[in-house]
């Protein structure tokens, strides 16, 4: 899968080559399973973001979500993912974790507890699932809009992701709010989403 299968740009191309090279360099006669795990864990702490993200995806396939969650929550310079990288990693790991059933979802919840911002587990789990129409009608729309004002980047990113998934705004309107922007630069975008929510506009069109 990792070498010849699905590609999830912009994270994977160089990481696949690094992964294949490291596997090929394993000593002859070594235990394949142990060698594979050694390579994945080494890539998980690599300085290159694409290698860390690729390892996070492979670990998530094994049912371990700590590395993925840590990367999704990172805010420090040099560790924080760019917007496209964040979206690609989230899409490659979190939906699958939720779709695998209660045990997998419980492991994901534990990863949010251990690696995510304090006190945000329930909100992050809800945003990772995405709201249904009944939840939007009963207040999830306001919750998502107010989450755009969160001090935590991962919360702002998830809130915007869910709002965009629901509303499907134009490219211009989608660009009004950038989660990574400084506080002052986010105010107008937040005001736009609040205005839309006040008009009952946070609803699916179909």
Residue ranges and their predicted role:
Residues 1-206:
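Extended repeat-based scaffolds of very large eukaryotic assembly and lipid-transport proteins
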């Amino acid at each position: 899968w990792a070498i010849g299968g699905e590609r999830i740009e912009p994270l994977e191309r160089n990481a696949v080559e690094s992964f294949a090279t490291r596997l090929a360099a394993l000593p002859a006669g070594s235990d394949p399973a142990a060698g594979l795990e050694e390579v994945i864990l080494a890539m998980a702490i690599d300085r290159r973001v694409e290698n860390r993200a690729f390892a996070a995806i492979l670990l998530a396939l094994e049912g371990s979500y700590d590395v993925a969650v840590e990367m999704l929550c990172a805010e420090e310079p040099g560790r924080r993912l760019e917007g496209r990288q964040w979206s690609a990693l989230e899409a490659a790991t979190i939906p699958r974790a939720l779709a695998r059933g209660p045990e997998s979802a419980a492991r994901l919840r534990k990863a949010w507890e251990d690696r995510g911002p304090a006190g945000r587990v329930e909100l992050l789990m809800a945003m990772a699932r995405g709201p249904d129409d009944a939840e939007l009608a009963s207040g999830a729309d306001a919750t998502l809009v107010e989450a755009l004002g969160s001090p935590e980047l991962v919360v702002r990113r998830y809130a915007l992701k869910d709002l965009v998934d629901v509303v499907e705004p134009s490219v211009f309107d989608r660009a009004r709010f950038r989660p990574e922007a400084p506080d002052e630069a986010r105010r107008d975008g937040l005001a736009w989403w609040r205005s839309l929510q006040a008009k009952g506009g946070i609803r699916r069109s179909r």
